[in-house]
Amino acid sequence: MSENRHENEENRRDAAVAKVQNSGNAKVVVSVNTDQDQAQAQSQDGED
């Protein structure tokens, strides 16, 4: 249970970051939205 809760918190944070990025570069982000970009975003989020 605790693991799922932790995962949900991380997903919410990633979603919030994605919203901020999309607000400024919606068209660009959509065209470059790949698994690699998501992996980079998660790694940066983890360092913070």
UniProtKB/Swiss-Prot annotation:
Domain of life: Bacteria
The entry's keywords: Sporulation
Region named Disordered: 1-48
Composition bias, Low complexity: 35-48
Induction: Expression is GerE and sigma K-dependent.
Amino acid composition bias (Basic and acidic residues), ranges on this chain: 1-16
Protein name per its UniProtKB record: Small, acid-soluble spore protein G
Keyword Magnesium on entry: no
One GO process term, biological-process aspect: sporulation resulting in formation of a cellular spore
Organism: Bacillus subtilis (strain 168)
Keyword Ribosomal protein: no
